[in-house]
Every structure is written in structure tokens, then in C-alpha cells.
From Swiss-Prot:
UniProt enzyme class: transferase
One of the record's GO molecular function terms: AMP binding
GO biological process, one term: AMP salvage
Protein name per UniProt: Adenine phosphoribosyltransferase
Assembly, per entry: Homodimer.
Family classification: Belongs to the purine/pyrimidine phosphoribosyltransferase family.
Keywords: Cytoplasm, Glycosyltransferase, Purine salvage, Transferase
Pathway: Purine metabolism; AMP biosynthesis via salvage pathway; AMP from adenine: step 1/1
GO cellular-component term (any): cytoplasm
Keyword Glycosyltransferase attached: yes
Domain of life where this protein originates: Bacteria
Amino acid sequence: MDLKEKIRIIDGFPKEGISFKDITTLIGDGEGLKASIDMFVEYLKDKEIDLIVGPEARGFIFGVPVAYALGAGFVPVRKPGKLPGETISVNYDLEYGSDSLQIHKDSIKKGQRVAIVDDLLATGGTVEGVAKLVEEAGGEVVSLAFLIELIDLKGRDKLGDYDVISLTQYDI
């Protein structure tokens, strides 16, 4: 299935000059959602994944069903103040500023094999921060998997030697 046929493009959102990739049309379509999950699983199934890590919020949409299909656990990555237990944090740079993300300190055990699943690879800043969190917790980042990659933003270049896959690619 061509997933691009299920992703709506909205020009001028959230501001002029942006061509927004709206995944709500894909996840609202049973065949499209199933196909995207199946594609992630097909890529990751032989990588001996212990945990799927997903950044909020759209990483949850894809990460949980992929974890289920692989028989792996799921670790949510949240903004500060959203997790009730003891956390570890990472600050990461955005195009215009910085942000922070957290996971529970005990959510990843030393040596666990981790795939990070998210909806979008743009500049790579968010996923680079998530990978640092995983490694700080003792996990091994085995793969970074995205529904969409905006290739002109060169996020893949920022991610060095990590194994990166994207199910669809767009020029911006």
C-alpha cells in the first residue's frame, strides 16, 4: 500500500510556507493504519527488540501496536511533569530554542534492545534527545523508525550511525 495516498497534505498550516502532513486521515483509515503498523513490524521483527520507545504524543499511536505485535514492552517519553515516578531527563535543541523530555528512571534495563518509533523525522533533534535518554538509562538503540521523513531537513544526517527507516519520504 502507498501510505502517501492516506496522508492528507494541508498547505499553509500551521503557518504560511508549511506543507503539513496530516496523519489523522491515515490513522482514521483501518487499512492505512494496519498497513503502517505492519510495515514497522516487518522491518523490526528480526532485530530482537525488547522495548519500543515512543515520544508523546504521536509516537504512542504507532509505538504501542508495534510493541504489541513484537511482544515487546512500551516506554512512553513525556514532557516534564507528566510522569509520576522518578525520572531522567534530556534537554535538546529545536530550530528556535530548546525543550526537555523524560522517561521513568526504571523503565529501561541495562542492555535492553530498543527501537524508537515516531511519526515524523524532520531535523532529528527530538529523536536524538530520545536516543540519549535511552542510552543514559542503559539501553541499546537498535533502530529509529518513522512514518514520515522530511528529507530536505536532513534529520537523518544528524543521527550518525543509528539505523534509520522511514515508511514515507517527502520533500518539504
